[in-house]
Amino acid sequence: PEVRQAEARYMPYQLKTTLESSGYWGSVWVVPQRSDAVDLTVTGRIDLSNGLDVGVHIGAWDATGREWLNKGYTVRIPEKAYSQYREPGQDPYQVLYNQIANDLLAARRKLSAAELRTLRNVAELRYGAQLVPEAFAGLLEQDRAGIYRLRRLPAEDDPMVSRMQAVREREYALVDTLNEYYANLYYEINKPYEDWRKMSREEVIRYQDLKRSAYVRGTAGALAILAAI
């Protein structure tokens, strides 16, 4: 459906802004596919979204292949989440994004400063190996579980490292441009998407009320028949 396609672009951008506003992360981008140029990749699947309930499955893996997060989230959205008096910038699904952000931060805090430095080095070398495999051969090893480990760092004056870093910076610039597109789309659909969620929430509640009342009537009828017998 068109709404789900729009959500698939809107929700990652809302999570991006949530992570950035927390102040615990550096650059956060929305990208169409995984990239070896980054330290951590977060992926998601929308399982349910009707304005009243939202359910997603989130996975997060760092450049070493280590899993940070792999779990489902289901949240019931209260009516006050759609209030015009809520805090500016707060999405009706904000509680969901906050839960994901908190879990990612908890996973990061389990790593030492040395482990985080190694993670950044592995991300850089994996990207370099993708560009020029022979120049970065032997710097990393991958175990049977698929985890990358740092064997050694290249020489500080290695010209291939400088070239790789220059290429990566150009890729970052392209991703920045792509995120301007996502930002424009985000602000363009923000109001109609919220209106749809609010209306959908009310319809879901009405439908559930009708089902409940129909069940009560049916049960009462069955009891009446039993009593008559």
Predicted regions and their residues:
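N-terminal segment of the mature soluble domain
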Residues: P1-D36, Q99, D103, E180-Y181, ...
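Acidic helix-start/capping segments at beta-turn-to-alpha-helix junctions
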Residues: V31-I46, L119-R126
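Amphipathic beta-strand/beta-sheet edge segments enriched in Tyr/Trp
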Residues: T43-Q84
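C-terminal/domain-edge helix-coil "capping" segments
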Residues: L69, R76-V216, I229
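Hydrophobic H-region at the start of alpha-helical membrane spans
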Residues: G218-G221
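Short hydrophobic membrane-inserting alpha-helices and related fusion/pore-forming segments
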Residues: L223-I229
